[in-house]
Design a protein with these regions (language model features):
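Helix-loop-helix connectors at the membrane interface of multi-pass transporters/channels
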Residues: 1-3, 76, 109-140, 240-244, ...
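Membrane-embedded translocation segments of transport machinery
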Residues: 2-5, 9, 169, 173-322, ...
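Inter-helical loop and helix-membrane interface segments of multi-pass membrane transporters/permeases
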Residues: 3-7, 34-39, 69, 74-93, ...
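Transmembrane helix-boundary motif of multi-pass solute transporters/channels
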Residues: 11-51, 238, 249-252, 256-259
Length: 454
């Protein structure tokens, strides 16, 4: 399949917004702000920026290089550079990882849609116990979560079958600006609440006394996972880049957008939480239990405004989830239609149906039945563990070794400098990082997940 009939991004802004949309996800909302607030505020953010420069951006550029050079799905892109060696299996690992993540990530994405519906219907009003029970009852229901998982897959499927320009790029040009507009509206509303300044201070006041080994390790982990490295998304989208795309500048712009969304999410969450004396947590419980309670209390005197803010928040989450799901879906769609030599619609249908089945089983494992739990862990949690803690760091680690030590330096330099049309002053630094620094940092991230450093 040639590059001409694969499609490509039609504009620079479309390329940036689509790829940034793949990186921006629910983790920007439920993980980064909490981590920043707990681990030194602006001090953590500075450490995180350093981690992005040392690890996130070099890894992203590496996947850009492999993807654009291959001009094909992720597995084939690695195969083209591997010359028949075992390195090709790194590409297949990324496709497999993306496939598994697509299935269970859609479950949480479906929860966001359910909460949009619940906000519209006013179902989230009540005391903290009611809201907590609402989430528990919904997530363990055998029907509704599966229904919403299928719903978000159908939305994603509709985008994907329209191709790169007519689907992914066109949708991203709408959804990413909408995401920022919604973020800004909620940030303004939250910051106007009484005692909101305490929440802003919690997030942004630098406390360098908290900066220790764990802060550095957590910042490294966040910078790695937030860039969507190791799951094929970056490599697949890069296969649609033109030869004129500046890979370093694109990676820098995407990382800035990703950080900006995360910081704005913190400015949305903490002022509202502190205004009612609630201590925010992280993970799904933050967005599906804590924040509905915060909105109920913070806007108790203005129920209509509270209804609007709650609705906008879950629309925002749904948009963030959908842009990530689109990139994951495309990893697998491009793989199936190119490797099986079928059209895009058939490839997308294979992904939608198979991943919806995976999602259904993952959803059912969260309380509807105990037959989908193994060794005390639900199937959903097993998918999260295997992909997040093993496959992603392994794929990232091997990609650094592959590009840094196996792929001919001239190929890497040609891609980095757009075949000599860019000066490429930073190429030497990039190559040093990807050969010697990034593999070590990813290995530290891997060990830290298992509590090796305490």
């Amino acid at each position: 399949m040639t590059d001409s009939n694969r499609g490509s991004f039609g504009s620079k802004i479309g390329l940036i917004l689509a790829t940034a949309g793949g990186a921006v996800g629910l983790g920007n909302v439920w993980r980064f702000p909490y981590m920043a607030g707990q681990e030194g505020g602006a001090a953590f953010i500075l450490v995180y920026i350093g981690s992005v420069l040392l690890l996130g951006i070099p890894c992203m550029i590496s996947e850009f290089i492999i993807g654009r050079h291959g001009a094909s799905n992720t597995a084939r892109a690695y195969t083209k550079l591997s010359n028949g060696t075992a390195w090709k299996w790194v590409g297949y690992l990324e496709v497999l990882t993306g496939f598994l993540i697509t299935g269970y990530y859609a479950v949480v994405s479906g929860w966001c849609l359910q909460y949009v519906y619940a906000s519209i219907m006013g179902e989230l009003h009540g005391d903290p116990t009611f809201v907590a029970n609402y989430f528990k009852e919904f997530s363990s229901d055998p029907v509704r979560p599966v229904m919403w998982t299928v719903a978000i897959f159908l939305i994603c499927h509709f985008v994907i079958i329209h191709g790169v320009r007519g689907g992914i790029e066109k949708a991203s040009k709408v959804m990413m600006p909408v995401l920022f507009i919604l973020l800004l509206i909620i940030v303004v509303a939250a910051c106007l609440l009484p005692d909101a300044g305490k929440g802003v201070e919690f997030l942004l006041k630098p406390d360098f006394g908290k900066v220790d080994r764990n802060v550095f390790l957590n910042a490294l982990g966040q910078s790695f996972y937030s860039m969507s490295i190791g799951m094929g998304c970056i490599c697949t989208y890069a296969s649609y880049f033109s030869r004129q795309t500046n890979l370093f500048k694109s990676a820098l712009q995407i990382s800035i957008i990703d950080l900006l969304v995360a910081v704005l999410a913190g400015l949305m969450i903490f002022p509202a939480a502190f205004s009612v004396g609630v201590s925010p947590d992280s993970g799904p419980s933050l967005i599906f239990i804590t924040l509905p309670n915060v909105f109920n209390q913070a806007f108790a005197s203005l129920p209509l405004l509270g209804w609007i803010i709650s609705l906008l928040f879950y629309v925002l989450l749904s948009v963030a989830a959908l842009t990530s799901l689109m990139s994951l879906h495309e990893v697998n769609t491009s793989f199936f239609y190119e490797e099986l030599k079928i059209d895009r619609k058939k490839g997308a249908t294979i992904v939608t149906v198979s991943c919806a089945v995976i999602g259904a089983f993952c959803s059912l494992s969260l309380g509807a039945t105990d037959k989908l739990s193994f060794f005390g862990k639900a199937l959903f949690d097993w998918f999260d563990f295997v992909t997040g803690q093993i496959f992603l760091p392994l794929a990232g680690f091997l990609t650094c070794l592959f590009l840094g030590w196996y792929v001919p330096k001239q190929i890497v330099q040609d891609e980095f400098t757009n075949w000599g049309t860019l000066k490429g002053r930073l190429f030497g630094i990039y190559l040093f990082l990807i050969k010697f620094v990034c593999p070590v940092l990813i290995f530290l991230v891997f060990l830290n997940q298992f509590g090796v450093f305490g």
